[in-house]
Amino acid sequence: MIMSSYLMESNYIDPKFPPCEEYSQNNYIPDSPEYYSRARDTGYQHHHQELYPPRASYQERQYNCASIPEPDTPRGHGIPHSAHLLAGKGQPASCETPQLSMSPATPPAAASACNQATPEHPNSTASSKQPVVYPWMKKIHVSTVNSGYNGTEPKRSRTAYTRQQVLELEKEFHYNRYLTRRRRIEIAHTLVLSERQIKIWFQNRRMKWKKDHRLPNTKVRSSSSGSNTSSAAGGVAAASATNSGPDELSGAQHGEDITRL
């Protein structure tokens, strides 16, 4: 009922929200929103003027090379003595401009020196990256490849021991026929020889000592002992076969006698 009466009566006015025409007739609503913006501006300007008083008017002047102001000196440092002299004589401040322009010109010279030094740096890095080949890393017995290489390894040169080296090696062999690695290194350093040369000399010297004393070779001795053991085993097997023959025959005859009974 309330909704239908409200729709039928088109002239019904809600008392809470009066029409805008009454506000416009009574000048409650301004024609443009300038009213609010002006109120804000005026209030802000008034507050700004109270906090910050207006500055005094100053006359703008044009600057040129002769009227460049001097840079502010940092705290704790006074004005240079030359500036006092120039100010006392009445010379313009533009005379100091070359000094200001000269100071920035120094870094390019340093930069050029750095640029000249940089090309040498890659060479040093390249040389440092090259692997260092020590003498012990090289193969002494392998010769360089040449055009006349026929595929066979060249003959190794025979080491010629001096009289003093042979004497020291004979002394060591008299006390120790077999060397440890530590002792071999010590002898090699003492006689200025390689470990391989010391090892080969002792091997040859042991073979000579066995030949002089007529000692049998261990390899031949082991092979002969193996053949003797095999022959002995064959003889034992044959003897056991011959011994077991009559017993088997007597057993067979005894079985036949039992069956006959």
UniProtKB/Swiss-Prot annotation:
Fetch the Pfam families from UniProt.
Homeodomain (PF00046)
Recorded hits in CDD domains, A to Z, give: homeodomain
Per the UniProt entry, what species is this protein from, by scientific name?
Oryzias latipes (Japanese rice fish)
Q: What GO MF terms are annotated?
A: DNA-binding transcription factor activity, RNA polymerase II-specific; RNA polymerase II cis-regulatory region sequence-specific DNA binding
What broad taxonomic lineage does this protein's source fall under?
Answer: Eukaryota, Metazoa, Chordata, Craniata, Vertebrata
Q: Which GO terms describe its biological process?
A: anterior/posterior pattern specification; embryonic skeletal system morphogenesis; positive regulation of transcription by RNA polymerase II
Q: Which Gene3D superfamilies does this one have? A: Homeodomain-like (1.10.10.60)
Keyword field contains Aminoacyl-tRNA synthetase: no
UniProt name for this protein: Homeobox protein Hox-C4
